[in-house]
Amino acid sequence: MTIYHSVTELIGRTPLIQLHKLDTGPCSLFLKLENQNPGGSIKDRVALSMINEAERTGQLQPGGTIIEATAGNTGLGLALIAAQKGYSLILVVPDKMSREKIFHLRALGAQVVLTRSDVNKGHPAYYQDYAQRLADELPGAFYIDQFNNEANPLAHRTTTAPELYEQLDGRIDAIVVGVGSGGTLGGLQAWFAEHSPHTEFVLADPAGSVLADQVETGRYHDAGSWLVEGIGEDFIPPLAHIEGVNRAWRITDREAFTTARELLKTEGILAGSSSGTLLAAALKYCQAQTAPKRVVTFACDSGNKYLSKMFNDDWMRQQGLITRPQAGDLSDYIALRHDEGATVTAAPDDTLSTVLARMRLYDISQLPVLENGKVVGIIDEWDLLRHIGGDGDRFALPVTAAMTRQVEFLDKHAPESALHAIFDRGLVAVINDNDRF
């Protein structure tokens, strides 16, 4: 058994698995498990390559500070390696990234700066522009800039591509990739153009991104928005040689998330949202073929960073990505049903400190108060603030000291106007379904 001496030695040489329980048409579909890298994603390869090259060229000095703009996974790879090598790290991250990624980055010692995800390149709050400005202002800082760093595609040209070729004995008809920084596409294309020029490249692009437009028409318009993390752009990354892509598929958030969830259920592989996008496009490509082909795509990162989002049914419903059957009455308005175990509740004799802990744990702002299975009140953050004030001892008070009893009950068959009337009075409504809610 091999003994390793640094976590960085575990980067790369990831396993390849053939998928058997999804509809791949006449094709054989293989998934390279980049989620098995120590930082949990394909970006570990890129982070190691960029830091090694910066050290070699003298751009990064011992004890220096690295700055990067990242959707999360490059940051995790950089944080992992920076911690091993003794560098400080500042990461500028769009605010749509999952909490798990943010927690992981900070636990590795990175300083995380959140910025807006609703602005385009050129805006001062855009994450790449923000990172460049920080690097300019901080003496001795090195902006590693994965979007323009040739060591990014170099990682895939020297490791990912030859690994794939060896694992499949050189027989690869198509590779399905996504584009964030463009390094994976650019690096793989460069290597396969030399060693396997017949291999096709297929782009999996989130609906709303401009990259599929560029592939299909040679031009693009304003970007939309999407929830998938890590791939898709509102510009053409210079490292992504889009002209070498043979086909592109636009994948909606719903398709991406449901495909990733299906991958877990059928194949037992916990992968992230970008992996769902790639797999959905790969399945479309495979199903469109009339002759057998050997197709490869990637589990780009682990799904453990998305448990509070993509793998959370409540979050998926709130985003409109999964829906219940419509009943045609007020029960259609219920986001979380208590009879399905989906609500977090308090008891009248719980302490206010217990309520606050539950709000923080579940990231919610109010709780129904239940006694013998019946709602007797509601307690929210304002109730806590109003009753605690600056006196910490008051956290020991029971819920009944702070909750409001101004709750109105409606049968699910009541007219919508009755619900609107309750809201107009500033009250909380509980929808009853017989003896359930």
Go through the PLM ranges and name each one.
Residues 174, 247, 366, 401, ...:
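Residues at the N-termini of beta-strands
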Residues 50, 332-334, 339, 359, ...:
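Methionine-biased hydrophobic packing positions in alpha-helices, especially
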Residues 370, 376-384, 437:
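Short hydrophobic beta-strand motif reused across regulatory alpha/beta modules
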Residues 244, 327-343, 350, 395-407:
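Bateman (tandem CBS) regulatory domains
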Residues 1-333:
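PLP-dependent amino-acid enzyme catalytic core
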Residues 381-400:
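A short, polar/charged loop-to-alpha-helix boundary motif
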Residues 344-363, 370-371, 388, 408-427, ...:
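The conserved cystathionine-beta-synthase
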